[in-house]
Structures are given as structure tokens and as C-alpha cells.
């Protein structure tokens, strides 16, 4: 995220692609780990691969429907792809948690874009 803020998008993308390789290996070893699926979704989203990102998030939600990170990041993906109603569905899941993920997704919905 810091590289992106400094305008070093190419360098950030290189790190995300490298992370994907390690995450895919971890996912192969333990495909039922929602945290790994969340990170795979995040890294794919960051390089602009929204289709694969959404797949990883949705598989993660099948395993852990209330996973805070997945619900937040999938909601942000929906905001970034103009599916606000779907983003609000993810926000509803986070509603009772009184957590940072709820606040960040709510801000993304209100602003119409994600800071990530």
C-alpha cells in the first residue's frame, strides 16, 4: 500500500504478483484456509484481476461466511465494480462486529471507491 501511495504502482504490482506465487503454494497445501483465500483475493484485486479475486473471496466465504477481512474486501471489490447493493450485503454481515472492517467498507460505500 505504501508503494501505491508513493506512485510506485509498477513496483507494487511486482510485489503482489510475487505474493500470489507464495499464496498459491500455501493454498495448495491447505485449500480450506480462509485467510489465504482472502489474501489471494486481495492480491488479485490489487493487480486488477477482479474476476479471480471475486472467486477467491467467494470460496473463502463458503468456508467462513462471517470472515471480517473477506467480507470487507469483497465489499470493496463490489464498490469498485459498481455493485453497491452487493457491497451493502457484505456490510450487513459486518454490522454487529464494531470493527475496523465495517468502518472501512462503510466509508468505501459512502465514497464510491475503496482506499485499497
What does each model-identified segment do?
Residues 86-116:
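Terminal, low-structured helical/coil segments at or just beyond the last alpha-helical repeat
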Residues 35, 69, 101-104:
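Start-of-helix register in tetratricopeptide repeats
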Residues 29, 63, 94-97:
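Structural marker of alpha-solenoid helical repeat scaffolds
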Amino acid at each position: 500500500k505504501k508503494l501505491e501511495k508513493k506512485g510506485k504502482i509498477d513496483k507494487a504490482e511486482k510485489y503482489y504478483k510475487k505474493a500470489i506465487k507464495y499464496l498459491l503454494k500455501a493454498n495448495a497445501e491447505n485449500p480450506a484456509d480462509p485467510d489465504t483465500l482472502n489474501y489471494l483475493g486481495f492480491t488479485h484485486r490489487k493487480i486488477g484481476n477482479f474476476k479471480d479475486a471475486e472467486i477467491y473471496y467467494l470460496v473463502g466465504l463458503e468456508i467462513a461466511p462471517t470472515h471480517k477481512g473477506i467480507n470487507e474486501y469483497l465489499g470493496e471489490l463490489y464498490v469498485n465494480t459498481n455493485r453497491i447493493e452487493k457491497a451493502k450485503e457484505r456490510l450487513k454481515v459486518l454490522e454487529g462486529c464494531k470493527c475496523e472492517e465495517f468502518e472501512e467498507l462503510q466509508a468505501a460505500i459512502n465514497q464510491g471507491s475503496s482506499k485499497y
